[in-house]
Amino acid sequence: MYMRLAKRMLLETDKRLVWKLAWNMGFRGWRSVQKHKARLKRGEFFPPYLYISIINSCNLRCQGCWVDVGHKQEKIEVEPLHRMINEAKRMGNSFFGLLGGEPFMHKQIFEILEAHPDAYFQVFTNGHF
C-alpha cells in the first residue's frame, strides 16, 4: 500500500513540486545539519532548523492549547521577520517552521513566503484557512 502511494505521488504530482521538495528537504536539509555539526565543533550554536511563532492569535478555542485567545494580538512584523530568516539562511538554514496561534491569521504570511523562494516553510495550521 505504501509503495503504491509513493509511486502515485511521484508519478502524478507536478515534477517541479517533487524536485523542490527533494531539493529543499533532502539536499538542503542535509546540508543544514552538516553546517550545524561544523558550527558545534567550533563551539558555535545556531540550530539547523528554525521554528518561528509569528502570531499569537487563533480562530479556534481548542482545549489544551497554549494560545490565550483573550490576550491582545501580537505578531512579528514583516521586516524583522525577513531579517531573522535572512540571518538564518546566511548561517546555512533553509528549513523554517511557522507557527502561532494560527499562522494564516498573519495578514502578510504570503508576502513572507514569496520573499524567500529558496527556503522550505512548514506551516503549522489548524486547517481552517
What are the functions of these language-model segments?
Residues M1:
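Conserved N-terminal ligand/cofactor-binding loop architecture of enzyme catalytic domains
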Residues K7-F129:
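Conserved alpha-helical substructure of the radical SAM core
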